[in-house]
Amino acid sequence: MEGVLYKWTNYLSGWQPRWFLLCGGILSYYDSPEDAWKGCKGSIQMAVCEIQVHSVDNTRMDLIIPGEQYFYLKARSVAERQRWLVALGSAKACLTDSRTQKEKEFAENTENLKTKMSELRLYCDLLVQQVDKTKEVATAGVTDSEEGIDVGTLLKSTCNTFLKTLEECMQIANAAFTSELLYHTPPGSPQLAVLKSSKMKHPIIPIHNSLERSMELNSCENGSLSIEVNGDEEILMKTKSSLYLKSTEVDCSISSEENTDDNVTVQGEIMKEDGEENLESHDKDPAQPGSDSVCSPESPWEDNEEVIPTFFSTMNTSFSDIELLEDSGIPTEAFLASCYAVVPVLDKLGPTVFAPVKMDLVGNIKKVNQKYITNKEEFTTLQKIVLHEVEADVAQVRNSATEALLWLKRGLKFLKGFLTEVKNGEKDIQTALNNAYGKTLRQHHGWVVRGVFALALRAAPSYEDFVAALTIKEGDHQKEAFSAGMQRDLSLYLPAMEKQLAILDTLYEIHGLESDEVV
């Protein structure tokens, strides 16, 4: 069972609405269903807690583990409280009955095992005696065949009985104790099917310490699954990893590759038809015959100029790749994939100190994605999602897709401002971050969040370390061609990003969706 209940937080905040989930005998609560991917804020085991109905307030109930946990809850109505009481009571009763039955079976099996072990010791002693008797007969050289057959028959019978009893002991032990060792937690423990930013790494043989990139796997059920691989190591994926990539579409800078089993779309390194990467395509004439990755004749780089790939040129999806639809419609899926692709920039700045910023950005992406997957045919563009919520009068409701997109575009403006500072030649990363923050997010943050950001600035990397993190191949940042490559890639990336953010700004201004709320 799941639903909203009011939980007593403290004397300052009082009763606050929380989303509760009862699953597997455990009651967990979250800020909202959309925030469930962050993990529960608290939980209580129904089998060991007491359910108390308030004597005065007919909408209130208390869940108590004496001396440990106290959940003071209120329903929105008497009928709703009754439904929760029935569900909680049933869960507690089922778990209690199950535990009682298991304890009873465990006690019986323990007793049976003790009995069998006593029999085993008896047969063991008997075996020792019969072996000694057999030795005596053999040593004495007794020729009475009848006595010899009698001793041998007894020994064989005792051995068979000993082995049979030992087997019974093992069967009892397996039935009684193995399951207890396997299940330290109840088998029905809740496995919450919520949206998570799940990440997995494929077993690719490492070449060097290179930049990590992410590929997005769209799931109809729970959003997007991000698979992290190393950019330069994509060339080994066909032979070294479980993803078999097939080249299907080639243009000047990217190729689209599709895994037929998992519908994984990869845009990045250009591959030959035989599946091998043309590693020298960056060092040779782009129009060299025999290569499948042929750039157009209008290539702005000269034949002898080394073209070094960067983080932005090897993105699996980029804002510069997005083609706007009719009436400047921004395609939802491509936009969200591009947002995911730029998130690793925050890891280059500091995976720990910038974790809250990254979490907020990813959380807003997921909220929009959750809305999108409810009706992919209708919500093909971001504008359609916003207009749908405007018409339903839920655009400014907390945790709506419109609100999530509002904060998402603010976060993207911050990243764009920072990258613009770097492109314009700012060598101090702290200064670049501070300037970008002051122009974008600072006006929407209260003094607490501003203080957190100020602390994060102190841990910002040096310009050299940040640039090194944007390389695909270790040591490329020391080459002169890398700076030109960064300028080239950002000159394509940032204007495309700015254009789409400007479209969203216009949309929000027209419908009065901008908010002055400070967090």
From Swiss-Prot:
Gene Ontology CC entries for this record: membrane; nucleoplasm; trans-Golgi network
Gene Ontology terms for molecular function: ceramide binding; glycolipid binding; glycolipid transfer activity; phosphatidylinositol-4-phosphate binding
Domain comment quoted from the record: The PH domain of FAPPS binds the small GTPase ARF1 and phosphatidylinositol-4-phosphate (PtdIns4P) with high selectivity, and is required for recruitment of FAPPs to the trans-Golgi network (TGN).
Subunit structure as annotated in this protein's UniProt entry: Homodimer. Interacts with ARF1; the interaction together with phosphatidylinositol 4-phosphate binding is required for FAPP2 GlcCer transfer ability.
Residue positions where Phosphoserine is found in the record: 145
Domain PH: 1-93
Localization (cell): Golgi apparatus, trans-Golgi network membrane; Membrane
Topological type in the membrane: Peripheral membrane protein
Main subcellular localisation: Golgi
InterPro entries on file: GLTP_sf, Glycolipid_transfer_prot_dom, PH-like_dom_sf, PH_domain
CDD domains per UniProt: PH_FAPP1_FAPP2 (cd01247)
Region of interest (Disordered), ranges: 275-302
Name this polypeptide is given: Pleckstrin homology domain-containing family A member 8
Organism: Mus musculus
Keyword terms: Golgi apparatus, Lipid transport, Lipid-binding, Membrane, Phosphoprotein, Transport
GO BP annotations, alphabetical order: ER to Golgi ceramide transport; lipid transport
Gene that this polypeptide is encoded by: Plekha8
Region described as Glycolipid transfer protein homology domain: spans on this chain: 330-473
Pfam family, one: PH
Function: Cargo transport protein that is required for apical transport from the trans-Golgi network (TGN). Transports AQP2 from the trans-Golgi network (TGN) to sites of AQP2 phosphorylation. Mediates the non-vesicular transport of glucosylceramide (GlcCer) from the trans-Golgi network (TGN) to the plasma membrane and plays a pivotal role in the synthesis of complex glycosphingolipids. Binding of both phosphatidylinositol 4-phosphate (PIP) and ARF1 are essential for the GlcCer transfer ability.
Keyword Mitochondrion: no
Modification sites for Phosphothreonine: 139, 153
Transmembrane segments: none
